[in-house]
Regions:
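Short beta-strand-loop/turn "lid" adjacent to the catalytic site in phosphate-handling enzymes
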Residues: 50-88
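Short glycine-rich, Thr/Ser-proximal phosphate-binding strand/loop in the N-terminal lobe
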Residues: 2-45
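Short, low-complexity, intrinsically disordered N-terminal peptides in bacterial proteins
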Residues: 1-2, 51
Length: 88
């Protein structure tokens, strides 16, 4: 599955794309102090609750908040084993 991350000034939205539809979406407040590990613990808990094992094979990050991009990149590489495409 593709992990799509849309980071705006107010909220960051995470979504799982299965190739045909969004299998799940989650939203959290954007905070530049949040670490990659915090993102992962939160996201994995929601994935587990929804029955979505963390089988992410790719990721894309769209962001208007440059200070957050580094930790989102680390989230993708460290916890999902993929190098994200960053746009925006």
């Amino acid at each position: 599955m593709l992990l799509a991350i849309d980071c705006g000034n107010t909220n960051t939205v995470f979504a799982l794309w299965d190739g045909a539809r969004f299998a799940a979406t989650w939203r959290m407040a954007t905070d530049h102090r949040r670490t990659a590990d915090e993102y992962f613990v939160w996201l994995k808990a929601l994935m587990d609750l929804g029955g979505h094992a963390p089988r992410v094979t790719g990721a894309v990050i769209s962001s208007t908040v440059p200070r957050v991009v580094f930790n989102l990149r680390v989230l993708c590489s460290r916890h999902f084993g993929c190098r994200p495409l960053v746009v925006g």
